[in-house]
């Protein structure tokens, strides 16, 4: 029999957070569903999100497909905290007037210049057929943090196994063929960059 000698740990070195801001306590979060958001991939949740940003600092977004038809601009201290970028989706359906047509780039999500925002755990999906769309315009500065965020793009995972578009899980299923994938790919080529860092944007 082999014996192992162990000693109890006398102390633990405190976690060095460095430049990475910590999430606020969960008691300070407001659940977007409790404010009336549906997250069903069909209902328009735009105004629910806009009002939440005006009233609350820490907005929790559980899993769901949240249709946002207009640009969403955060305040200086707004934090968007999603459950998981694979299941928490902010999406703009294809052909949305706010993001399609011709003109300057238009961001789904914008952080203010010098903001101290935290954005995490979400999937920003602008759809391939919104040609002016940018997923995120990031101008937040020191003390801000973006992590675990997914952007829509050249990704076959855009489709479910039954052919439904990830931009709208309720639409009529589309047969998956080389031709349909080619159409999507060419549509993405017309779109702007996904992450637009400008005006001194930075953070962690």
Kindly give the residue locations of the regions a language model identified:
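A generic local structural motif
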Residues: 47, 66-67
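Beta-rich ligand-binding surfaces for carbohydrates and other polyanions
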Residues: 135
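Extracellular "leader-to-stem" segments immediately downstream of a signal peptide or signal-anchor
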Residues: 1-59, 85-87, 91-120, 125-126, ...
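Beta-solenoid repeat scaffold
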Residues: 64, 70-93, 117
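Low-complexity, polar/charged sequence tracts that form flexible coils or short amphipathic helices
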Residues: 71-73, 138, 187-188, 197-199
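Leucine-rich repeat
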Residues: 128-132
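Beta-propeller domains
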Residues: 190-193, 200-204
